């Protein structure tokens, strides 16, 4: 039986932690003409791409190898895929070229550090093979007239999610007053209808809130204030947690005539549903009053 030594376990652990991460590169500068511009590459020769400033928020998708400390893109070569690593040339930063690529460290804030990173700049008219630098800023290694920039990596995809979750766990928890989103006010599809019924010698105004479903007939007394609980039938689309609102009918008190107390029958029909959904059918509510003199 073979046992793993401590050195072997350490090697396995470091290999497991190494990962290929998806990144994009951006330029940071005090000069607004180039600040926050994404970086992309353009073909300038056989398996050779120069880095240029593209546009704000627009950047090429690249990869970063934690183990080899290299930034690279993948180049299709027939049925195989080869790495085209970032190299710092004599005057320009490029993908491809000789060597295994420049060793790059990425800080927690995304800043790239490598040999010559302190002198990186953006410049035009660098006499590149295809003359792209006539209209676009090339990413160069120093030089007179170059605008100083700092390269910053932004993680994308799953790496972005893991980075954001780790940073949020390290940050203090915000208070409820500052982080809670305002609660949405529920919207109910109800409508209010006002009916005018003439009595002798007084008049009464009745206001009903009718639901979007079929409502049940209710007899309402013509004097006093009455709360009608059966006017609204719970809507199928309404939230089950929301309590159905009650309808209050206010009427003007009047002397009750001698004999049988008069009553008024108020009925809400299905026409309310059409009016609530923007239809042209009016809500039909009938109030029949029987009076005995």
Swiss-Prot record:
Lipidation (GPI-anchor amidated glycine): 271
Entry keyword set: Cell wall, Glycoprotein, GPI-anchor, Lipoprotein, Membrane, Secreted, Signal, Virulence
Known glycosylation sites: 131, 190
Phenotype when the gene is knocked out: Leads to hypersensitivity to caspofungin.
Record has Transferase as a keyword: no
Induction: Expression is regulated upon white-opaque switch, during cell wall regeneration, and when cells are grown on lactate. Also up-regulated upon milbemycin A3 oxim derivative (A3Ox) treatment. Repressed by BCR1.
UniProt PTM: The GPI-anchor is attached to the protein in the endoplasmic reticulum and serves to target the protein to the cell surface. There, the glucosamine-inositol phospholipid moiety is cleaved off and the GPI-modified mannoprotein is covalently attached via its lipidless GPI glycan remnant to the 1,6-beta-glucan of the outer cell wall layer.
An annotated GO cellular component: extracellular region
Stretches assigned to coiled coil: none
Highest taxon above the source species: Eukaryota
Localization per Swiss-Prot or TrEMBL: Secreted, Cell wall; Membrane
Membrane protein topology class: Lipid-anchor; GPI-anchor
Keyword Glycoprotein among UniProt keywords: yes
Region Disordered, annotated ranges: 161-187, 233-262
Spans traversing the lipid bilayer: none
Known role: Component of the cell wall involved in virulence which plays a role in the relationship between C.albicans and the host. Involved in the regulation or assembly of chitin within the cell wall.
Record protein name field: Cell wall protein PGA31
Native species: Candida albicans (strain SC5314 / ATCC MYA-2876) (Yeast)
């Amino acid at each position: 039986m073979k046992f793993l030594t401590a050195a072997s376990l350490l090697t396995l652990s470091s290999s497991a932690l190494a990962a290929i991460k998806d990144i994009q590169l951006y330029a940071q500068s005090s000069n607004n003409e180039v600040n926050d511009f994404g970086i992309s590459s353009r073909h300038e020769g056989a398996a050779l791409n120069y880095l240029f400033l593209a546009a704000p928020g627009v950047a090429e998708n690249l990869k970063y190898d934690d183990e080899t400390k290299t930034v690279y893109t993948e180049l299709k070569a027939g049925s195989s895929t080869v790495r085209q690593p970032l190299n710092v040339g004599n005057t320009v930063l490029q993908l491809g070229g000789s060597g295994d690529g420049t060793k790059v460290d990425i800080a927690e804030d995304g800043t790239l550090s490598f040999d010559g990173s302190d002198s990186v700049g953006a410049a035009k008219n660098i006499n590149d093979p295809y003359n792209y630098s006539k209209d676009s800023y090339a990413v160069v290694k120093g030089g007179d007239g170059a605008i100083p920039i700092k390269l910053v990596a932004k993680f994308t995809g799953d790496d972005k999610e893991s980075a954001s979750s780790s940073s949020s766990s390290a940050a203090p928890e915000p208070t409820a007053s500052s982080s809670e989103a305002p609660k949405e006010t529920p919207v109910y599809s109800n409508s209010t209808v006002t009916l005018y019924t003439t009595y002798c010698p007084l008049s009464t105004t009745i206001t009903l809130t009718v639901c979007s479903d079929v409502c049940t007939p209710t007899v309402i007394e013509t004097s006093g204030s009455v709360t009608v609980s059966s006017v609204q039938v719970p809507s199928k689309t309404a939230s089950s947690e929301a309590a159905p609102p009650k309808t209050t009918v206010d009427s003007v008190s009047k002397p009750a005539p001698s004999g049988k107390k008069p009553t008024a029958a108020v009925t809400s029909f299905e026409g309310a549903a059409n009016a609530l959904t923007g239809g042209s059918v009016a809500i039909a509510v009938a109030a029949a009053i029987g009076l005995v003199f």
